[in-house]
């Protein structure tokens, strides 16, 4: 209500401010602008708030009242202009009545609204009749006065007064119309509030469902956020574990590389030592081989000398056996001397043979072979008998060939 009152006050102030005090301007104000403004404003209000079809609108009645009042009060020229404008406004009203109104068919046209509308129309008609009755004597007086000779200044003053009266009446009617429109707007707002409440009641289950869905969505979002935080924590822990594993592996690899380097160095040192030892052993073996080869040559020489000695001994034995029966007829004294000489020679020979055999055994021991058991036996006072004497003719045991390796043949 406050906003509508402000609008009405502003419009009234503007209308009052638009009135001029000069006598020349009053006629121009009385001709067309007020009537046009009122009719156009009434048409606008009628377009906003149209009555149901088949009923005359209050705005059209008010506009017609204003035009009739102007036609009775103003001069004939002004009346002609007002009639023309009235015809135009009537044509506009017919056009507005023929056009479909936007509020037709809406649920706002209830029984209460129709009753209030009819009541307002009755009030407007009564006011119209009262205005006609009050204006009839005034119009007669104006006609009488027009016949009389009136000065121009009084005519101008009367015109101004009449224009002011007409404007005040138009403003009062506009105020009434605005009050009516405000009441209609209030009713429409009430109806709209009722509709809004009904719609809210209809939409309340859907809103509850929306709230439920919103809660579910919020819980899901919270769960997703918690899962995302957990995944981020797991990723951080995995990254830290990977970094630790990489650091450990790098440290282990570095330690292994150091150990491998140290082991390589140690192995190279060991290889150098082994090479030195191998070279030393190889040199020693070469020296031993040289010594063995020399010893073998000496043994071969000794064997050859031994063979020669055996041959000599066999020859001497044969000579002794051959000479033995011849010496049987010699006296015993001579036999004793020969025997002693022969025994001495044999003892010397046997000593030489034993010395050679011992030297051969020593060489064999130094070479690592088993010494061969000597088949020669002799003593200082040994007496050879034919049954116990070995066969000196076979020299197969003493003439065995040496092997390629230079080792002495086994016994």
Swiss-Prot record:
Organism, scientific name: Mus musculus (Mouse)
Query: What binding partners and quaternary form does the record give?
Result: Interacts with DYNLT2. Interacts with GGNBP1. Interacts with OSBP2.
| Compositionally biased tracts (Basic and acidic residues) | 91-102
Q: Which PANTHER family match?
A: COILED-COIL DOMAIN-CONTAINING PROTEIN 159, TRANSMEMBRANE PROTEIN CCDC163
Is Coiled coil one of the keywords? Answer: yes
Positions in coiled-coil regions: 269-305
State any GO BP term from the record. Answer: gene expression
Q: In which tissues is it expressed?
A: Expressed in spermatids but undetectable in the spermatozoon (at protein level). Highly expressed in the testis (at protein level).
Record region (Disordered)? 84-113, 372-411
Q: Does the keyword Coiled coil apply?
A: yes
* Keyword terms, alphabetized: Coiled coil, Differentiation, Spermatogenesis
List the protein's name: Coiled-coil domain-containing protein 159
Polar residues biased stretches: 384-393
Q: What does this protein do?
A: Functions during spermatid development; may participate in the centrosome reduction procedure of spermatids and is required for the formation of the connecting piece/sperm head-tail coupling apparatus (HTCA) and the correct and tight attachment of the flagellum to the nuclear envelope.
Q: Which GO terms describe its cellular component?
A: sperm head-tail coupling apparatus
Source species taxonomy? Eukaryota, Metazoa, Chordata, Craniata, Vertebrata
InterPro entries recorded: CCDC159/163 (IPR039284)
